[in-house]
Every structure is written in structure tokens, then in C-alpha cells.
Design a protein with these regions (language model features):
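C-lobe/activation-segment region of protein kinase-like
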Residues: 136-218
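Catalytic-loop of the protein kinase fold
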Residues: 119-134
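Core catalytic subdomain of AMP-forming adenylate-forming
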Residues: 226-248, 282
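Conserved structural core of kinase catalytic domains
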Residues: 55-59, 64-109
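Juxta-kinase regulatory segment immediately upstream of eukaryotic protein kinase catalytic domains
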Residues: 1-17, 200-201, 208-225
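C-terminal boundary motif of the adenylate-forming
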Residues: 238-257, 263-267
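ATP-binding glycine-rich loop module of kinase domains
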Residues: 11-67
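Conserved C-terminal "lid"/linker of ANL adenylate-forming enzymes
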Residues: 249-254, 263, 277-348
Length: 348
């Protein structure tokens, strides 16, 4: 599929930062002159020098993968790639952990998508994550995030193994959200992990974890601690002693390679530096001053909303705003000023 010159050369207008980690920054927006074409930029020009080789290695894999799947229904469209980063179409849809499809039609379409990718010689290699699967507004399947994708020149054993693992990971999603739809054949496939996958878990994954979590201070945020219960009372007492602070709400979020961080939303007109000076040791990792906390009818803070902001869960927030549109005026300023821009997820 060829991109028209007026689209490929159009100026990117940023709107929302979705994620920022050591390897890239993900920003959604639009193209100037094309308001009906939402796009997303994986921005690479701000990556620190020591992470640049890996960041561009991942970017080149994504570029090759996106070029190979052009024209496949459910795959993003690569618009351009340059020293700034790579720009692709924004795929409208709901992440699988929210959509939780129970209809056989979605899984049938997801298999169709993997089959067409396989014909193009592409394996995704990262669809174990439910957030990389989408249910589009018309109920179709879509995939995003091709950073780990492989484009295979031949259909040898490695290709067949990786394609099988893609399918097996789709079946794991099916087992999570629609277990009654699994066939006996699919259940047998789920019970047998390929030998290369077992070798990866035993050898390469520990090395990968050491590099990313220890050397590069980056992780998937595994493990939780109840820091709110342990440190919250002293923090709340110290902050609430100030006459310009009217309330404090505490949430947790996943720290890179360090467990769990404490995120404090403080209802005040003080600046963040002033709040940090008031906090006892150990202080919360993030302190966000807010003009007004979102509240329930009884006046208590909406901790469900604040937890989604603290963990940068924009998809869930968008779904919440659709079901509760009156929340918009209260939480949009908080979302715009949020301090955690990673996509790590707390796991108990």
C-alpha cells in the first residue's frame, strides 16, 4: 500500500503522551490537514545515548514488520520513519483486557489476522500481552506494537516455531476471556510449549531481565507492596498539617526494577516542590498537586479514577469517560498533568 505524499509529508501535531520509557516516547496526535486520520509517533530522538542502539534496533524491527504487513486488515499503517522516530496510523479499538471478547467471531478473525501475517512471513512475538490485541469498533481483531516482530525470508523451523507461539499466545487470551470456546485441539496446544520457548525461559529470559531491570532500570513492574497502608498515615498527617492542603489521595504504580512506587495526589494550590519539602522520609516517588480531587456523591475521593491515572491506564480512563461523561471536567486536567508515563502494570 502506497502512502500519498501529502500524508507522508504532513506535519505531526501531538496531542497525548501515552508512554515514556528508556527506549522511546509514544505520542498520539493527528496530521496537519488530515483531521480524520489519527496517528501515533514512536519518538526516538530523545533516547539517552546508552540506550540508543537497542532503541533503534527495536525501531528497525518495527519498521520492517510494519512494511511487511501493509494492507493486512487489522495491522497499523506505517506512514514514515526518520531520525525523529516512526509514525504510524492509530488503530481504533479496545484493548483485550477491557474488551474481554466472549464471541467466537473475534477469535476467528484474530486467527485470520495471524494467518495473513504468516503468509507475509511475519511473526509478532509479543502478543502474549493483551494490550497488544484490540477489538475494533466493528468487532474485528487488530494488533499493535511490532517492536519485537520478525520478518522471515524463509519458512524454516524457526519461522514455524515462532508462528506457532503467536497462535498459542492467542489461545491463551481465549482461555482467559472465553475458555468455553476452546476446542480439544486448542487445549492440547496450550499444554505444550515449544522447545525454543522453554529454552528462552530457562536461559535467555534471565539475561534479558538482568539487562533491562538492573542495568537499564526498566521492567514490567512485577511484585506489589502495600505502601499506602505502611507509609500513608505518616505522609497524610504531615501534609494535612499545612493549612493550604485540603485532602490527600494515595495510589501505587509499578516502578522500573524497584517494586512499587507511591503516587500522591494532593488537593492544594501549593507547588510540587513545596509538597516534597513537607513530606516525611521516605517521600512518595511522585507528588501531583491538583486543584480539586474527583469525588463521589458522598464527598470521598474517586480512588478508582486516581489509580488509573497513577498507572497511566488511558484506555480504561477513556472507557470510564464514555460511561461517565460528567467526569470529564474533573479528571481531564489531572490526566494532562499526570507524572507516570510508563506502561508498566502492577501484578500481585
Amino acid at each position: 500500500m502506497t502512502i500519498a505524499p501529502d500524508i507522508s509529508n504532513a506535519t505531526f501535531v501531538p496531542e497525548t503522551v501515552h508512554k515514556r520509557d528508556i527506549f522511546s516516547e509514544t505520542i498520539s496526535g493527528r496530521l496537519d490537514g488530515h483531521p480524520d486520520m489519527p496517528v501515533v509517533l514512536r519518538k526516538l530522538d530523545g533516547v539517552p545515548p546508552y540506550a540508543r542502539p537497542i532503541a533503534w534496533y527495536l525501531a528497525r524491527k518495527e519498521i520492517r514488520g510494519l512494511r511487511a504487513v501493509q494492507g493486512i486488515e487489522g495491522c497499523p499503517l506505517l506512514i514514515r520513519a526518520n531520525k525523529v522516530g516512526l509514525l504510524r496510523s492509530w488503530t481504533k479499538g479496545t484493548p483485550l483486557q477491557l474488551a474481554k471478547p466472549s464471541d467466537a467471531a473475534w477469535y476467528k478473525d484474530a486467527k485470520r489476522l495471524l494467518r495473513e501475517m504468516r503468509r507475509a512471513g511475519v511473526t509478532h512475538n509479543d502478543i502474549a500481552k493483551p494490550q497488544n490485541w484490540l477489538m475494533t469498533p466493528d468487532g474485528r481483531a487488530a494488533v499493535i506494537d511490532f517492536q519485537l516482530a520478525s520478518v522471515h525470508r524463509t519458512r524454516g523451523r524457526l519461522f514455524r516455531t515462532m508462528a506457532r507461539e503467536d497462535l498459542r499466545h492467542l489461545l491463551k487470551q481465549k482461555r482467559a476471556y472465553a475458555p468455553d470456546l476452546l476446542t480439544p485441539c486448542e487445549q492440547r496446544m496450550l499444554s505444550r510449549k515449544a522447545l525454543p520457548a522453554r529454552l528462552w525461559m530457562a536461559t535467555a529470559k534471565p539475561a534479558y531481565n538482568f539487562i533491562t531491570r538492573r542495568l537499564m532500570n526498566w521492567s514490567d513492574g512485577e511484585g506489589t507492596e502495600d505502601r499506602v497502608e505502611r507509609e500513608g498515615p505518616a505522609l497524610r498527617t504531615a501534609l494535612m498539617a499545612h493549612p493550604q492542603i485540603t485532602d490527600v489521595a494515595l495510589c501505587t504504580y509499578a516502578l522500573a526494577a524497584k517494586g512499587v512506587g507511591l503516587y500522591a495526589f494532593v488537593e492544594t494550590d501549593l507547588l510540587a516542590d513545596d509538597l516534597r519539602a513537607l513530606a516525611p522520609n521516605p517521600p512518595p516517588e511522585l507528588i501531583q498537586p491538583v486543584a480539586q480531587l474527583p469525588r463521589r456523591a458522598d464527598g470521598t475521593p474517586r480512588l478508582d479514577v486516581l489509580q488509573l491515572i497513577a498507572t497511566n491506564r488511558l484506555d480504561e480512563l477513556a472507557a470510564m469517560l464514555e460511561s461517565e461523561p460528567t467526569l470529564g471536567d474533573q479528571i481531564k486536567p489531572l490526566i494532562a498533568a499526570r507524572l507516570n508515563l510508563t506502561d508498566r502494570m502492577l501484578r500481585s
